[in-house]
């Protein structure tokens, strides 16, 4: 996982820690790959108010919900591309962007550069 994701669990109540575990489980099930995935959907899955979910994510991860989602999407994309490159598999970068949950290529490139420090072409030497 990209090193930018921290987990600050200090001061969480037992209930909040339970929500944290549920959030991790959902993200491990790759709910972020749905381009329409949003805070209201996550909150409904948790049966927790959206405002509280947002505050909990900010406390635990030190970032907004959408930044966290996009970080997971970039990480998924990175893992896929690394797998393809190491196995000599051809891929379509636009398809992989969509598969990662991004429905806007420009938005993807902005986040990729923000998190990885380079464009995908530079990062993977494509």
What are these regions (language model features)?
Residues 64-66, 118-125:
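Short, Lys/Arg-enriched C-terminal cap helix and immediately downstream tail that follows
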Residues 51, 105-106:
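Key DNA-contact positions within bacterial/archaeal DNA-binding proteins
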Residues 33, 125-126:
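Generic structural signal for short, solvent-exposed loop/turn connectors between secondary structure elements
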Residues 1-95, 100, 111:
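Membrane-proximal linker segments that couple transmembrane helices to downstream signaling/catalytic modules
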């Amino acid at each position: 996982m990209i090193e930018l994701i921290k987990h600050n669990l200090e001061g969480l109540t037992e209930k909040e820690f339970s929500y944290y575990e549920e959030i991790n489980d959902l993200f491990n099930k790759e709910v972020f790959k749905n381009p329409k995935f949003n805070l209201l959907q996550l909150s409904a899955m948790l049966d927790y108010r959206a405002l509280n979910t947002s505050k909990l994510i900010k406390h635990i991860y030190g970032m907004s919900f959408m930044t966290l989602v996009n970080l997971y999407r970039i990480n998924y994309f990175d893992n896929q591309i690394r797998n393809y490159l190491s196995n000599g598999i051809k891929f379509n970068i636009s398809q992989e962007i969509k598969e990662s949950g991004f429905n806007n290529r420009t938005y993807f490139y902005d986040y990729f550069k923000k998190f990885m420090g380079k464009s995908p072409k530079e990062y993977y030497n494509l």
